[in-house]
Structure formats: structure tokens, C-alpha cells
Amino acid sequence: MAEKAHYERTKPHVNIGTIGHVDHGKTTLTAAITKMLADKGLAEAQDYANIDAAPEERERGITINTAHVEYETENRHYAHIDAPGHADYVKNMITGAAQMDGAILVVAATDGPMPQTREHILLAHQVGVDYIIVFLNKTDLVDDDELTDLVEMEVRELLSEYDFPGDDIPVIRGSALGALNGNPDDVKAVEELMATVDEYVPTPERDTDKPFLMPVEDVFTITGRGTVASGRIDRGQVTVGDEVEIIGLKEEIAKTTVTGLEMFRKTLDQGQAGDNIGALLRGIDRESIERGQVLAKPGSIQTHKNFKGEVYILSKDEGGRHTPFFSNYRPQFFFHTTDVTGVIELPEGVEMVMPGDNVTFTVELISPVAIEKGLKFTVREGGRTVGAGVVSEIID
């Protein structure tokens, strides 16, 4: 009997998703990818209905329907996100529990780019999805190749408009439905698509390799030993003896050394991304550190007061506001572990924002906070969530 290949859990992990206009074939393509890989023994085939009936999830108080599919190629393990409705997409990309490392933009060759195509490209740009691969779908329904060429040109121009390298982005042509039905040419196109995703979307840097960052959740004193800051390490790692900075809420940055670490009441030499730890800090008194600040590798993150955010405002049904808001609205912005009041300025030509809208606006915080592009936040009013967003640009 032939020896079975040993399953190794060593493949790098990448998050991707399908984006694009409604009915252009995102979900059919997702199903076709799983079928093609299942035939190679690398995935479980998921049928269309299965993916389309996405379960509801609550992410930061917002209800989103999202389908999570996982599969492997020869080189990688993928988590693939597909959201059925347009509103689900918008919410998912802004609040996204899963940050996409890359996206497959599905455009029907029969229609060309449509309003949601544009909106999804804009969102991908705003929330920091750096890599897009295009799948021109339904090419079997277009008689003239020149028409398909025109659609490809339009898509490339649209991508360039939002700062993606439109001329260089890989474009694959095929039919997702054909692939699902086993048509060899279309199956080949889906194989080519996944080979391209493997190659074009770089493996993301692992969280543990990034510079150390831990939002402070709690501070307490151990008599005779000093001050301990506790929290969950967001990224990177920290070792006893490391120098760290205490950043945020105050203009000045304090430097200190980690003299001890503990987790689950046991001492620890090193903490890493995902660990809930307490860090004993040398020469820091109880008053000079507070919840909402961060501990960070020196020089790795700065505080800012002004930023642009891409934000989804909850609808009334989602427990959000019942009325619109205008420029100079002053809610709280919840970053890391604390609320900071900020003043909103709407972009030119936008009079007001209605519940259920997504919008880009500028914020001036009343205290400096350790923030960077891509950081997620919630907008709150009197303790309840009225919006969720992501920092799209730092303004100094």
C-alpha cells in the first residue's frame, strides 16, 4: 500500500477575500476555487448555497454576514472571506476581524466595472489591502475578445485611480461557473488564478516578528517590587531586560526597562503576540502610567492627534444613532483600551452623515494617542458604539 503523505502544519498562512460588484460571481468563484483544490486533495469543496448562506457574526457590536472558507494550495494555507451582501462587504472591510492580505477582484466581462467595483477598490485602498488580483469572469458569454480587452483596460484604469499598480496587476480570464461545472479550460483558469495569488500576494510578516506593542489594560503596584502594567501583546515579543517606551495620552514619552514578566501567575522570560501578560517596569510609579497608553519597542510608534478615518456608521436597527451628525460632532474614539474625545470634520461637499452610511472624515483628538495607518477603532457616544473605523491616513 502506498504510504500516505504526512500532513505538515508548516505552510505559511494568508488571509484573502473576494471583492466586487453584486452578481459578478464572487461566491461562484469561491466555490470553484474550493472544488478545484478539493480535486487535488487540498480542500473541502464548498457548494454555492453553503457559502451564500453565511452565518451572522457580531464584530464590535455590528452584525455582519460573512462566509469563512479555508483551503490550501501546494504552498500555502488560506482563509478566504466572502460576504453575500454589499453592506456586509463594507462593514467587513472596515471593521474586519480578518484583515485581508490580498483580494481577488471579480469583474464580469459582460458588465465591466460597476459602482460597487469602484467602492470596493476604494475601500481596499483605505483599509490597507495592498495586493489585488483581477478575475475577469463570464468571459464565455462575451463573443468578441476586443470587448473583454476593453473591460480589462477599464479595470486597470480604475485600479490606478486608487493608487494600485493598475498596469502591473495580474488579470486572469475565465468562467467561475464553467470551472464549477468541470469545464477543463475554466478549471485551468482557476488553477492559474490560485498560482498567481500564491506568487503575487507576499506572505505577511508574522505578528511575532513585528515591533513589540502592548496596549495597557490595567496597572497595579506590587509592594516592594514596583509597578506592573498588564494587557494582551498586540504584536512582537518582549523579553525581560528589554527597554520599552510608555506612549500615549501625554505629550512626553517615558522610557523604562521590563524587569519581570508573568502570565497566569507564573514568571516568564519572554512574552509574544497574543499573550496576556503583566510586565514589571523599573522606576515607574503608579501615577505615571495608565490604561489606554501602550508599551512599545522604542521608536516604533508615535502619538498623533490628527488622522483621517474610513468609518461605517451604525444604522438605527444596529443600535446606532437615530439622527444624522454634522461637522464638529464630538464623540469618543475607542483606541486600544480607552476612549478619547475627538472632533470630526466632514469632507467638502458632505453636509451630514446618516446612520448606515460609510464615510471618510478627519478627526482631531483632544489627547495624543499611539496610532498608525490600519489601526481599527470604534466611535462611541455615552458608552454605546455608533460607528467602527480604521485609520486611513495620519495627518500631522
Curated annotation (Swiss-Prot):
Enzyme Commission number(s): 3.6.5.3
Binding site for GTP: 20-27, 82-86, 137-140
Compartment(s) where it occurs, according to its Swiss-Prot or TrEMBL record: Cytoplasm
Enzyme class at the top of the EC tree: hydrolase
Function description: GTP hydrolase that promotes the GTP-dependent binding of aminoacyl-tRNA to the A-site of ribosomes during protein biosynthesis.
UniProt source species: Latilactobacillus sakei subsp. sakei (strain 23K)
Origin organism lineage: Bacteria, Bacillati, Bacillota, Bacilli, Lactobacillales
Region G2, annotated ranges: 61-65
Name of the protein this chain belongs to: Elongation factor Tu
